[in-house]
């Protein structure tokens, strides 16, 4: 096999993230067997034109996800070679078609494996099968075209793998399945899109790190190789450190990296001669120390290495030398050389060659000397002083104080100037730069805080004033809008009544003229020699004895009603013309019979007995004028599949697998806290009950108004909106009673000594008709809200009645249900011409005889969807039914009555106030007069709407054969609402059953294809593993394992060490640089 050409040392030649300048060398590897990477046989198809070939070849290269250098090399190949490669790849893709070529198959398998929770160990064959499936996925992620990996990512395949890793039991975690799952992630990271997806996933690196808890050495090695390689990827180093911190909590480690050092130190059992794990651990440790922020920051390397030294890594490294493994020794050399280099550079800061970090005395002296003549020295002394004061108890939590201090100092050291932490932040939202800036500007911040507090208070005051003005403006705007609406309605009504008045006046004039003409003719006919009929006659004398003139017609009645007809003429006169039908009368259709003649139905009979539909038949004498006279269910029998209906609902059929292919406020109130208490001053005078006075004080404190302001608001009918509706409701609870007023009058000379509540009640009692004024004001503020609550209920009844009366879909559905019932029921229960609408909710009670999960309702929906698609608009045609079903007519009448009585009470108070002499500032009469005008018309409009709604409801009830006086709207519409809900649920259940069946069929089809192709797949997988080169991520892992990543740095360190040793030989300070045991 021809070796791959490497472009240089270090890691720049390995990973696509680190580009080099060398062009890749493409080699073609042939094998002895029939499976090889690029076959040299001539393509079976002729080569297309060069332009078309380039387009086809470009699509192929895109699927291979090559780097830019490799893409250029591929496009530089001759046209014949391009065509050969294209045909070879397309042939492989054709051979690989099958169940295992679909990412969906592997995702289903992963989900089913992860979902299995069993205490019993898997059988050997089953475990082998699961392992083969995971291995197959790993191979597919490495060898399949780019679209396979993209599809796998789009279907969230990574989350399926991670979920399996998180939920696997102990046996699985110790098996080959665990190793293969890690291999799948590794294979996914060989692809640029897959690698980006893994790194972008919020949990991926953490879940991978959790696999370090296994005892399976191969799995541990694979995990460490992935984590080490991620350290080399931009942005990956910090993710790895965060993952190790996550693993500390997951494995309950005392400190981070504890498990790694323990595994590195183990030398018994399976760990005795296991060099690969120890090499992987040292490779990971070197990657963590030298990459990320460790590339530039000495302080970060010292900080991170100190964690390993505290865990005792140095004695372990000395012991690892006994293995005498060249690859392991290379990693050990790099660790020690980098440590010596860093400690020497750190010592130069203090003009020393070495600092003994095990000596607290030396480190203290160096710190003290450094700060002695600086401004920081007093703070250093303060730190020492307070450290001496730190509480200390052997059994207490004292160590947590020192841990906090340690973490703060660590973060101060490693955090960069931008406030970014290269390591996982031990203290969240702790930005050193911001903290220092705050300390520098502490006095300035204090001043700004005081100024901000002052401005906040001013802002709150302005906000309160603004809200008050907004409330006042909203109230005025609402009043204006209501007045305009009322004015427009009154204008429309006046125009309508004027037109009606003119029409009636014209009718009266016409009738009067006809009456005079008829009377004249009658008189002429009764007088001999009188003018012949048709001759013009003179005026009738005003006083003719025995005159047969009828009295003049009465004037039209108010409201546009017609006057009563004139009295009948004397015998012999022509009969009067027939009068117009009464308003609102419904004329019978032309040719309609006076009685309802029912023709006998021809209903097909089932061959076997069927389950019955428990409906309530409508008596034939109640059919006239209902919807049932317009329904002919015999037409339905020509459309229905009666054999299928008979088979599904047979009374004696055995149960079997069956699937129907079909679709299937209370308000919370706030309570006033009555448990607060207040103390009265010693000299205050209070004659009111203590509990009542206490609650009154609470209310006044919430109002934040003086007694004069409250009094002015009541007299002006709160034109400035100082009193919210809830406060008015509470004020009504504290109206002065007669006993209170008498007591307060006795002590009115001691007004200055009165308590706050007493003074309030006393001053309110001085207002004429205070309680009636307060009630009128509260009613005025609540009127629009109450009307707004009533109108939707009235509108719901009106629109709901119209919808059920006019719905064509409902009528068609009733026809189908009637046909079902007549076909399924026999005897007295059958041969029906209609049924009560409550029977609709009994359809679901009839179960199928072959599947208890299928009801007559499910079957009905199936028929409707297939035969009567127009019925599917039923929910749209009856969209207001749910709201109408919530309306209780008794409560609605009660609300209307409350409005009527409240309005009457306000009118009574208005008449009283008009009779009283006006007081300064009293605007009750003007404000309430205007309100009464608007409110009376609005209430009249509501009453008219309610009357119309009741008429329509009565018409709808009779239309369905019900008795209007015995059924209320909530019950009537509730029947339809319940039925609509049942239909929706049944449609959803049908849809779920359909999806379930399709899913089962798909799984069966995929399993069958998998079984047929298993042998060929095994051969292909083996060929692919041998023929395909390792991906970029594999190259990176391989370089980490061998230590090639650190070759360049190691050579540099050796040169530096040699140079430093030469310098030290010439120096007076002779101190050999050796390994440091910690």
Curated annotation (Swiss-Prot):
It holds the Pfam family FH2. SUPFAM superfamilies: ARM repeat, Formin homology 2 domain (FH2 domain). GO terms for cellular component: ciliary basal body; cytosol; glutamatergic synapse; membrane; motile cilium; perinuclear region of cytoplasm; plasma membrane; presynapse. Residues 528-599 form the FH1 domain. Residues 45-420 form the GBD/FH3 domain. Disulfide bonds: none annotated. One of its GO terms (molecular function) is actin binding. Residues 437-526 form a coiled coil. InterPro entries: ARM-like, ARM-type_fold, DAD_dom, FH2_Formin, FH2_Formin_sf, FH3_dom, Formin_Homology, GBD/FH3_dom. Residues 600-1009 form the FH2 domain. Keywords: Actin-binding, Cell projection, Coiled coil, Cytoplasm, Cytoskeleton, Phosphoprotein, Wnt signaling pathway. Residues 456-480, 524-585, 987-1034, 1055-1078 are annotated as: Disordered. Residues 530-539, 548-585 have a biased composition (Pro residues). PANTHER family: DISHEVELED-ASSOCIATED ACTIVATOR OF MORPHOGENESIS 1, FORMIN HOMOLOGY 2 FAMILY MEMBER. The C-terminal DAD domain may participate in intramolecular interactions with the N-terminus. Homodimer. Interacts with CIP4, FNBP1 and FNBP1L. Interacts with the SH3 domains of Abl, BTK, endophilin, spectrin and SRC. Binds specifically to GTP-bound CDC42 and RHOA. Interacts with INTU; INTU mediates the indirect interaction between DAAM1 and NPHP4. Interacts (via coiled coil domain) with KANK1 (via coiled coil domain). Belongs to the formin homology family. This is Disheveled-associated activator of morphogenesis 1. It comes from Homo sapiens. The lineage of its organism: Eukaryota, Metazoa, Chordata, Craniata, Vertebrata.
């Amino acid at each position: 096999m021809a070796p791959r050409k490497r472009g240089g040392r270090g890691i720049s030649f390995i990973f696509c993230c680190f580009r080099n300048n060398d062009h890749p060398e493409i080699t073609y590897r042939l094998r002895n067997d029939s499976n090889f990477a690029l076959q040299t046989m001539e393509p079976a198809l002729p080569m297309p034109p060069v332009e078309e070939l380039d387009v086809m070849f470009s699509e192929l290269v895109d699927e291979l996800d090559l780097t830019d250098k490799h893409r250029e090399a591929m496009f530089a190949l001759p046209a014949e070679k391009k065509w050969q490669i294209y045909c070879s790849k397309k042939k492989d893709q054709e051979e690989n078609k099958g169940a295992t070529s679909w990412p969906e198959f592997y995702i289903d398998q992963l989900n089913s494996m992860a979902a299995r929770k069993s205490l019993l160990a898997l059988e050997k064959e089953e475990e082998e099968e699961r392992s083969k499936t995971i291995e197959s996925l790993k191979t597919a992620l490495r060898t399949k075209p780019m679209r396979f990996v993209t599809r796998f990512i789009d279907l969230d395949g990574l989350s399926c793998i991670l979920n399996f890793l998180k939920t696997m039991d102990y046996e699985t975690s110790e098996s080959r399945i665990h190793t293969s799952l890690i291999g799948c992630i590794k294979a996914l990271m060989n692809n640029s899109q897959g690698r980006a997806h893994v790194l972008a996933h919020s949990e991926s690196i953490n879940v991978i790190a959790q696999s370090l808890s296994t005892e399976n050495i191969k799995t541990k090695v694979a995990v460490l190789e992935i984590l080490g390689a991620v350290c080399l990827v931009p942005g990956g180093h910090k993710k790895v450190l965060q993952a190790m911190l996550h693993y500390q909590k997951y494995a309950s480690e005392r400190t981070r990296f504890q498990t790694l050092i323990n595994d590195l130190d183990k030398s018994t059992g399976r760990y005795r001669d296991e060099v690969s794990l120890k090499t992987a651990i040292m490779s990971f440790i070197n990657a963590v120390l030298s990459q990320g922020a460790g590339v530039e920051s000495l302080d970060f390397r010292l900080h991170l290495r100190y964690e390993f030294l505290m865990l005792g890594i140095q004695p372990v490294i000395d012991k690892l030398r006994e293995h005498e493994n060249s690859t392991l020794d290379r990693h050990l050399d790099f660790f020690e050389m980098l440590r010596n280099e860093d400690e020497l550079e750190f010592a130069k800061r203090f003009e020393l060659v070495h600092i003994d970090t095990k000596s607290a005395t030396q480190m203290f002296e160096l710190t003290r000397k450094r700060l002695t003549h600086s401004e920081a020295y007093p703070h250093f002394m303060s730190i020492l002083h307070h450290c001496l004061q730190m509480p200390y108890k052997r059994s207490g939590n004292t160590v947590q104080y020192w841990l906090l201090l340690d973490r703060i100092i660590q973060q101060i050291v490693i955090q960069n100037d931008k406030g970014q932490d290269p390591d996982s932040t031990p203290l969240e939202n702790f930005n050193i730069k911001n903290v220092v800036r705050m300390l520098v500007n502490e006095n300035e911040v204090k001043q700004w805080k005081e100024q901000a507090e002052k401005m906040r208070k001013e802002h709150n005051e302005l906000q309160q004033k603004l809200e008050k003005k907004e409330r006042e403006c909203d109230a005025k705007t609402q009043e204006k809008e209501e007045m305009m609406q009322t004015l427009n309605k009154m204008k429309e009504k006046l125009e309508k009544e004027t037109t009606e008045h003119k029409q009636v006046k014209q009718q009266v004039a016409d009738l009067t003229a006809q009456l005079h003409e008829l009377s004249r003719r009658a008189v002429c006919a009764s007088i001999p020699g009188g003018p012949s009929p048709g001759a013009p006659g003179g005026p009738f004398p005003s006083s003719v004895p025995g005159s047969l003139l009828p009295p003049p017609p009465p004037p039209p009645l108010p409201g546009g009603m017609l006057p009563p007809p004139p009295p009948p003429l004397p015998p012999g006169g022509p009969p009067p013309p027939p009068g117009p039908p009464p308003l609102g009368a419904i004329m019978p259709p032309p040719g309609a019979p006076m009685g309802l003649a029912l023709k006998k139905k021809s209903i097909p009979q089932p061959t076997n007995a069927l389950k019955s539909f428990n409906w309530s038949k409508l008596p034939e004498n109640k059919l006239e004028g209902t919807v049932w006279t317009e329904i002919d269910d015999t037409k339905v029998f020509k459309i229905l599949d009666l054999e299928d209906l008979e088979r599904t609902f047979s009374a004696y059929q055995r149960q079997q697998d069956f699937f129907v292919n079909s679709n299937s406020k209370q308000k919370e109130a706030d309570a006033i806290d009555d448990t607060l208490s207040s103390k009265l001053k010693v000299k205050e005078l209070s004659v009111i009950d203590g509990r009542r006075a206490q609650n009154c004080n609470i209310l006044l404190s919430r109002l934040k108004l003086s007694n004069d302001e409250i009094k002015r608001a009541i007299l002006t009918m709160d034109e400035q909106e100082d009193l919210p509706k809830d406060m008015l409701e509470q004020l009504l609870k504290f109206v002065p009673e007669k006993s209170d007023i008498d007591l307060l009058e006795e002590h009115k000379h001691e007004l200055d000594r009165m308590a706050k509540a007493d003074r309030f009640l006393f001053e309110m009692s001085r207002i004429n008709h205070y309680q009636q004024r307060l009630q009128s004001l509260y009613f005025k503020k609540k009127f629009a809200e109450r009307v707004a609550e009533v109108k939707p209920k009235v509108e719901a009844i009106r629109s709901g009645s119209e919808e059920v009366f006019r719905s064509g879909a409902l009528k068609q559905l009733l026809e189908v249900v009637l046909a079902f019932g007549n076909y399924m029921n026999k005897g007295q229960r059958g041969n029906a011409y209609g049924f009560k609408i409550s029977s609709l909710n009994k359809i679901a009670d009839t179960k199928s005889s072959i599947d208890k999960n299928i009801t007559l309702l499910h079957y009905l929906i199936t028929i409707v969807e297939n035969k009567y698609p127009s019925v599917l608009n039923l929910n749209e045609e009856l969209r207001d039914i749910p709201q109408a079903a919530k309306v209780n007519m008794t409560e609605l009448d009660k609300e209307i009555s409350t409005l009527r009585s409240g309005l009457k009470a306000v009118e009574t108070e208005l008449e009283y106030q008009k009779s009283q002499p006006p007081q300064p500032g009293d605007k009750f009469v003007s404000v309430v007069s205007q309100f009464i005008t608007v409110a009376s018309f609005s209430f009249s409009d509501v009453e008219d709407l309610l009357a119309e709604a009741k008429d329509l409801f009565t018409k709808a009830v009779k239309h369905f054969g019900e008795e209007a006086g015995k059924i209320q709207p909530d019950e009537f519409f509730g029947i339809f609402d319940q039925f609509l809900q049942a239909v929706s649920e049944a449609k959803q259940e049908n849809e779920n059953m359909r999806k379930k069946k399709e899913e089962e069929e798909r799984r069966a089809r995929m399993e069958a294809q998998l079984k047929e192709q298993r042998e060929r797949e095994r051969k292909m997988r083996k060929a692919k593993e041998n023929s395909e080169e390792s991906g970029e991520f594999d190259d990176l892992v391989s370089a980490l394992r061998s230590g090639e990543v650190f070759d360049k740095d190691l050579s540099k360190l050796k040169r530096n060490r040699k140079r430093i040793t030469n310098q030290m030989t010439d120096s007076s300070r002779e101190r050999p640089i050796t390994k440091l045991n910690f």
